């Protein structure tokens, strides 16, 4: 049975980090769903793209194997300020379930109180980095620490997605080839 992944969307989410991620995870054989934190069936991102979600956050996430927090502003801030979201983050962490956060969204992990002593990354810049003074902050594209996967931003969405697929027992190698990732990575663009 395919592993279930919930991508949490708040108003102002980063579209690339959410929708391209959703597409890639589904291509990789995961049962990925968009979950609204707004109570609405349609959620608008930070660049005006509106997406229809699969379910609401008020529904239980207990049957999911992973939750993912996309960045974008004010999306990541809205996720951070939603006590239901930080509650689910703490619950998944305590149950050793997978948690992913990209771009500005690691701020949600910090607010939930799960970053102390952890190795992670986020969108570059002092504004974000100073949130993680009690963490082992890295400049790597993707960082995996136990059941926590973090990444830098929109351009790192594919490596983030591939790391998630592999972490949940899939094999991203054929997907990388089929999506021309290795070719693009080798190019001098």
Locations of regions flagged by a protein language model:
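Cytochrome P450 catalytic-domain "roof"
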Residues: 144
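Extended, subdomain-level signal for the structured scaffold at the beginning of enzyme domains
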Residues: 1-95, 108-117, 127-139, 147-189
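Anionic-ligand binding patches
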Residues: 120
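Short, thiol/selenol-centered motifs that function as redox-active sites or metal-ligating centers
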Residues: 102-103
């Amino acid at each position: 049975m395919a592993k279930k992944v919930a991508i949490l969307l708040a108003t102002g989410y980063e579209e690339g980090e959410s929708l391209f991620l959703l597409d890639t995870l589904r291509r990789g054989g995961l049962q990925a769903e968009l979950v609204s934190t707004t109570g609405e069936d349609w959620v608008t991102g930070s660049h005006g793209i509106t997406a229809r979600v699969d379910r609401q956050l008020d529904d239980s996430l207990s049957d999911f194997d992973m939750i993912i927090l996309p960045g974008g502003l004010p999306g990541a801030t809205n996720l951070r300020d939603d006590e239901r979201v930080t509650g689910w983050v703490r619950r998944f962490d305590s149950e050793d379930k997978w948690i992913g956060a990209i771009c500005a969204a690691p701020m949600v992990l910090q607010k939930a109180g799960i970053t102390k002593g952890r190795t992670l990354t986020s969108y570059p810049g002092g504004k974000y980095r100073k949130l993680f003074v009690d963490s082992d902050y890295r400049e790597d594209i993707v960082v995996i620490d136990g059941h926590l996967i973090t990444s830098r931003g929109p351009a790192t969405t594919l490596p983030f997605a591939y790391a998630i697929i592999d972490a949940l027992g899939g094999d991203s190698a054929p997907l990388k080839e089929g999506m021309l990732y290795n070719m693009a990575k080798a190019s001098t663009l």
